[in-house]
Amino acid sequence: MESKEILLSNIDKLHTTEIGIDRIKRNLKINTENVVKYCKEKILDNNCNIYKQWKNWYCEVDNIIITVNSYSYTIITAHTKK
């Protein structure tokens, strides 16, 4: 398993697509103007559990899971934990 420091040191590379923005807003029931900023703040939270599985980083905090592609740093989705 790779160190979460890799993701944290590349935090400025985080981005998402228009479809990703809509998906994240819908899944988390949020109405923020800047979804990437919202996700960055969650990932940088000291309580965030960050781990890598296969090609994705998973960031768990405040009962949500944010999925980030480990190669492109694209925020793929975010959803509440079940």
Describe each PLM feature range.
Residues 1-82:
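Ribonuclease/tRNase effector modules and their secretory precursors
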